[in-house]
UniProtKB/Swiss-Prot annotation:
This is Deoxyguanosinetriphosphate triphosphohydrolase-like protein. One of its GO terms (biological process) is dGTP catabolic process. The keyword Protein biosynthesis does not apply. Belongs to the dGTPase family. Type 2 subfamily. Residues 69-217 form the HD domain. GO terms for molecular function: dGTPase activity. Keywords: Hydrolase. HAMAP family: dGTPase_type2 (MF_01212). InterPro entries: dGTPase, dGTPase-like, dNTPase_2, HD/PDEase_dom, HD_domain, PHydrolase_assoc_dom.
């Protein structure tokens, strides 16, 4: 199939007309499919708008041209739709999952997540996937009939399982959850709306997951180049980018550094999308899933890179870890950001009157457990933008690091 050509809807794609529905029954839309409605609800949500001022690596005032969680999510959605289109999957569901996958991230990226996880270590910790589920099922207050966005089962499943099953069929935790168990928020919601935590996710969710990796790799290279953390020639230590750069230099001799870097990022995205599609087609031919449920019960992810592309992608991640994520400038900022989150949490824990009125407990906290109380504080902080967290820290402590 030519790259970019849309395939007919596949038998293994999620069918909006066969959706497992929503937790709360609603009348169907006359003009939009259930998955299109999910996508639109995410776009119009408060949590999605806040992503504009939540960073991944750089803090918000480092520069207007660096990526935020919002721009990253939009880029993931574009890549995910491109892959879904070629595989005959439901593009609306794929887009909804791509746009929703980061809703649970706290301010300051992984630094904020580490801090909140430490603050809640005795009470289940903090997991951004569980927090994304909490946002779309409880913390959004936009509709009169229910809390959350009342998304379809397929979208909720994908938010939770886009990186693979959480348990085996017996309920034993798998992967990253083996040490501390599946997050309480996911377990509790699963009791009322079974997401089949033991099974693999739909192909649409798997596509959103690999699109996230592609976007991270390419766009963190772009941001790192813009920030001067490394140059295009430094990327020559990896065979894939060395070959791409050499080919660019032959086609465009004397190209200025900014355009040279931008062309490399474009070629990298194109290569990774093509590699993902080619391997997915190979695996789908081998597995021959006749339905979306056959995909879930395949026993393996079907959207993956082939070994050679996976090795190249792993080298990119290792390069970014050395030259960007652990760069002294970035590490210094992230250390200060963690301190801001730690101090905000401790302040609200010890002085609950400092919380906004809408975040104070109902009935003066009667019947609220300590775990519930601390989770409420966590939910408030996790919803903050970088800017609001710094402003709130300044208000409470009158001394806030500049995060530069």
């Amino acid at each position: 199939m030519s790259v970019g050509m849309a395939a007919p809807r596949a038998a293994f794609a999620c069918d909006p007309d066969a959706s497992r529905g929503r937790l709360f029954d609603e009348l169907p839309s006359k003009t939009r499919s259930p998955f299109r409605r999910d996508c639109d609800r995410v776009i119009h949500s408060t949590g999605f708008r806040r992503l504009k001022h939540k960073t991944q690596v750089f803090v918000y005032h480092e520069g207007d041209h660096y990526r935020t969680r919002l721009t990253h999510s939009l880029e993931v959605a574009q890549i995910a739709r491109a892959i879904a289109r070629q595989l005959g999957l439901d593009e609306d569901l794929t887009e909804a999952l791509a746009l929703a996958h980061d809703l649970g991230h706290p301010p300051f990226g992984h630094a904020g997540e580490r801090a909140l996880d430490a603050c809640l270590q005795r009470y289940g910790g903090f997991d951004h996937n569980a927090q994304s589920l909490r946002v779309v099922t409880a913390l959004e207050h936009r509709y009169p009939e229910f809390n959350g966005l009342n998304l379809t089962w397929e979208t909720l499943e994908g938010i939770v399982k886009h990186n693979g099953p959480l348990t085996d069929r017996s309920g034993a935790p798998l992967g990253r959850y083996q040490a501390h168990g599946v997050p309480t928020g996911i377990v509790e919601f699963n009791r009322c709306f079974d997401l089949e935590l033991w099974s693999h996710a739909s192909l649409e969710a798997q596509v959103a997951g690999i699109a996230d990796d592609i976007a991270y790799d390419a766009h963190d290279i772009d941001d790192g180049l813009r920030a001067g953390l490394f140059g295009v020639d430094d990327l020559g230590e990896m065979p894939l980018t060395a070959q791409m750069t050499a080919a660019i230099d032959v086609r465009y001799p004397g190209l200025d550094p900014a355009r040279r870097g931008a062309e490399l990022v474009r070629e990298l995205i194109s290569f990774l999308i093509g590699a993902a599609v080619a391997e997915a087609e190979r695996r789908l031919i081998a597995a021959q899933p006749a339905s979306v449920q056959a995909v879930r019960e395949a026993g393996q992810d079907l959207i993956m890179f082939a070994p050679d592309a996976a090795e190249a992608e792993a080298l990119i991640k290792a390069f970014l870890k050395r030259h960007m994520y652990r760069h002294p400038r970035v590490m210094r900022v992230m250390d200060d950001a963690e301190t801001v989150v730690f101090e905000l949490f401790a302040r609200y824990r010890d002085h609950p009157a400092d919380l906004p009125a809408e975040w104070l407990p109902a009935n003066a906290g009667q019947g609220e457990t300590e775990a519930d109380r601390l989770r409420r504080i966590c939910n408030f902080i996790a919803g903050m933008t970088d800017r609001y967290a710094l402003t709130e820290h300044q208000r409470l402590f009158d001394l806030t690091p500049e995060l530069r």
